[in-house]
Swiss-Prot record:
The gene is yacG. Zn(2+) binds at residues 7, 10, 26, 30. Binds 1 zinc ion. It comes from the Bacteria. This is DNA gyrase inhibitor YacG.
């Protein structure tokens, strides 16, 4: 059975095998369009910020001598 996927850029059907030169894209053009979208920040991977300013305030990071050696 042949597996096919849709090109992420143009939605054209692409055969998914080791001989598919540009997979998951149908062509070098579609691959470069996608790369340009990432470079211009049209695409982004959502992340949850681990930095919470309120938590730091509660820990005393705003104290002037917090980072001084004891």
């Amino acid at each position: 059975m042949t597996t096919t996927v849709k090109c992420p850029t143009c939605q054209k059907e692409v055969i998914w095998n080791s001989e598919s030169k540009f997979k998951p894209f149908c062509s070098d053009r579609c691959k470069l369009i996608d790369l340009g979208d990432w470079a211009s920040e049209k695409h982004a991977i959502p992340v949850k910020s681990e930095f919470d300013p309120e938590t730091l305030d509660g820990l005393g990071y705003d104290e002037a001598d917090f980072f001084k050696d004891q």
